[in-house]
Amino acid sequence: MPLLNSLATPYAEALLQVTEARGESQTVADQCKQLLEIWDSSADFRNAMVSPVLEPDAKKMALQALVGEQVTPSMLNLLKVLADRQRLLAFDAVMLRYLELYREQQGITLAEVRSAQTLTEDQQAALSKKVQAMAGTNMVDIDLSVDPSLIGGFVVSLGSQVIDASLAGQVRRLGLALAKAS
């Protein structure tokens, strides 16, 4: 992904500069997350946007129709520039890089949380408080994902620190302890 990162960085930096000047960087960060969810969940949309068969103007019209009313003009302009320059292949890299630069600028720590099942609102709130305490700051952005292979519990990645409170992790550690003992 280094090549995509080097391609994505100028676009992400430009978007951050524009949104910072307009006071909408938080709004655009939220929009990046929403657009990434759409991008990841719809293979048809993704395939159409990266297809060399579709003309840039058709892609821009589709983007305008799909998200034009729900995103800031800055975000819409970026999407149109990516379409014009045939760079929609790097769409997710641009969004992720923007989020990374935004967090860095705002002093926000990213916590990646994988749970065995979807968490309720109350569980998310409790987990958020615990992660904030672990990070030592209230400025924590939590990226939740579901990983059924964990069997139960969750795994929190906070920078280089990993807290494995999953059933699969406990079974693995028990197996290692038994192997060591014999």
UniProtKB/Swiss-Prot annotation:
It comes from the Bacteria. F-type ATPases have 2 components, F(1) - the catalytic core - and F(0) - the membrane proton channel. F(1) has five subunits: alpha(3), beta(3), gamma(1), delta(1), epsilon(1). CF(0) has four main subunits: a(1), b(1), b'(1) and c(10-14). The alpha and beta chains form an alternating ring which encloses part of the gamma chain. F(1) is attached to F(0) by a central stalk formed by the gamma and epsilon chains, while a peripheral stalk is formed by the delta, b and b' chains. It is a peripheral membrane protein. It holds the Pfam family OSCP. The keyword rRNA-binding does not apply. Keywords: ATP synthesis, CF(1), Hydrogen ion transport, Ion transport, Membrane, Thylakoid, Transport. It comes from Parasynechococcus marenigrum (strain WH8102). This is ATP synthase subunit delta.
